[in-house]
Amino acid sequence: MLVKLVELHKPEGDRVHLDEIYVSSAAVTTIRTESGATMLEEARQLGINGEAKFSRITISEGGMTRTAVVVGSPSEIKTKLNKKMLLRD
C-alpha cells in the first residue's frame, strides 16, 4: 500500500521545498525524530505550524536505501503506514 507523506526536501545550495511523496509502507525500515534546526526553521518559514513535528524515515529501494525528512512525529508516521484501507465494491 502506498502512503502519501509530505517531505521536506533541500537541494544542494537551494531553499527547503515541500513535496508530496508516496511511499510503500513495506519499504520504510526506520522512523526517528528529526531535529536538524536549520532545515526545520526554513520549513516553518514556509508556513508550517511551529508546533509541527518532523521525522526522518529510511526507505529501502531495490537494494539501496535513502532517507527523507517528513512532516509528522514518528508515532504519527507509524500510524499512517499501518493504516488499513477498506476496499469497496
PLM region spans:
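Acidic, Ser/Thr- and proline-rich intrinsically disordered linker/docking segments
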Residues: L2-V3, H9-D89
